[in-house]
């Protein structure tokens, strides 16, 4: 009986792909070695312990329909588009060894004519006339009896968009959690013009088979063709939820301030698990009562633009004579946390 399993995703949905990865990892036999190949449409993928409001320009992501996906491994934030090929190697212990999977990826690149080297803990680099450039980054996860190594290969990614989404607005966040390290990167098309996702997948697959001396047929999966994965619906629901992608952020504080024609406003938020645990409001407005009332209402509110806007606008019923000021405030607060 073969010990290998090869899965290739036809879906570009990051939540689907990460849910498949999680389910396979949980239910695979400890004697199995798995290779999962996939790619995501426009997505910022953050590490398990990261703060999306600190790492990402969440406002621009919303404007451009870029998804946020939190993975179950550690490490930093990365931008995925269809110019990235993603790979996941899984194995039970003691078989699991990330140096083996790194060797397989290096062998695949070598078969395509690219000489790359492992650098540090997570990266693969190539030599270019401009110096060493990163073409692959990885992250890892281990449990008591198994582990996985997943990463990306930059084929023809739109590198200009990295800065669009991974450089956040200069919000006044005093955040805990893991900050991403920006790296000098390059696409493999710089060395191999015309290289495709399919060619890279084939090369990685052949290197995987060669290392283990076995071959298996690929299982092609999509939302219409999912293998029998226990608890997949629940895992996908969690992976795609606001509570997981945003609400799992480490605790942080956010200071907002603005001057309106009717007065200056300062808001101080403490946020834990995506909820405001403490809110302070300061103002020099001649009519401070609505803002004083707002502080209490914000306690426990989801740190989400639509919920904050609703909370501010709900005060209009109590303070109708200040409707215009409250609508202006609501619009500003919602925009500031997007």
Swiss-Prot record:
GO terms for molecular function: ATP binding; lipoate-protein ligase activity; lipoyltransferase activity. It is an enzyme of class 6 (ligase). It is found in: Cytoplasm. Its EC number is 6.3.1.20. Residues 29-216 form the BPL/LPL catalytic domain. It catalyses: L-lysyl-[lipoyl-carrier protein] + (R)-lipoate + ATP = N(6)-[(R)-lipoyl]-L-lysyl-[lipoyl-carrier protein] + AMP + diphosphate + H(+). HAMAP family: LplA. In the transfer reaction, the free carboxyl group of lipoic acid is attached via an amide linkage to the epsilon-amino group of a specific lysine residue of lipoyl domains of lipoate-dependent enzymes. Monomer. Belongs to the LplA family. This is Lipoate-protein ligase A. It comes from Salmonella schwarzengrund (strain CVM19633). The lineage of its organism: Bacteria, Pseudomonadati, Pseudomonadota, Gammaproteobacteria, Enterobacterales. The gene is lplA.
């Amino acid at each position: 009986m073969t010990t290998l399993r090869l899965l290739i995703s036809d879906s570009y949905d990051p939540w689907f792909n990460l849910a498949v990865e999680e389910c396979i990892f949980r239910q695979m036999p400890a004697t199995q070695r798995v290779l999962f190949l996939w790619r995501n449409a426009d997505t910022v993928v953050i590490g398990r312990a990261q703060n999306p409001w600190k790492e990402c320009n969440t406002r621009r992501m919303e404007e451009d329909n870029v998804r946020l996906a939190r993975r179950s491994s550690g490490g930093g934030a990365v931008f995925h588009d269809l110019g990235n090929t993603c790979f996941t190697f899984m194995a039970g212990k003691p078989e699991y060894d990330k140096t083996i999977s790194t060797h397989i990826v290096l062998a695949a690149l070598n078969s395509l004519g690219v000489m790359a080297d492992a650098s540090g803990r997570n990266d693969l680099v190539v030599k270019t006339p401009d110096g060493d450039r990163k073409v692959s980054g990885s992250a890892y996860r281990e449990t008591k009896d198994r582990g996985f190594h997943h990463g990306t290969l930059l084929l023809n990614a739109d590198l200009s968009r990295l800065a669009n989404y991974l450089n956040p607005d200069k919000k006044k966040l005093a955040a805990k959690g893991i900050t991403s390290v920006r790296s000098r990167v390059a696409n493999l098309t710089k060395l191999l013009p015309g290289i495709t996702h399919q060619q890279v997948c084939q090369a990685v697959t052949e290197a995987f088979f060669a290392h283990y001396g076995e071959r298996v047929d690929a299982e092609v999966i999509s939302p219409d063709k999912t293998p029998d994965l226990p608890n997949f619906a629940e895992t996908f629901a969690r992976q795609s939820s606001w509570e997981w992608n945003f609400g799992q952020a480490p605790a942080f504080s956010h200071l907002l301030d603005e001057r309106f024609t009717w007065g200056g406003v300062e808001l101080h938020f403490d946020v834990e698990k995506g909820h405001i645990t403490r809110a302070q409001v300061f103002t020099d407005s001649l009519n401070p009562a609505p803002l004083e009332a707002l502080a209490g209402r914000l306690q426990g509110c989801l740190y989400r633009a639509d919920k904050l806007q609703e909370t501010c606008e709900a005060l209009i019923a109590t303070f109708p004579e200040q409707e215009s000021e409250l609508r202006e405030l609501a619009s500003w607060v919602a925009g500031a946390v997007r």
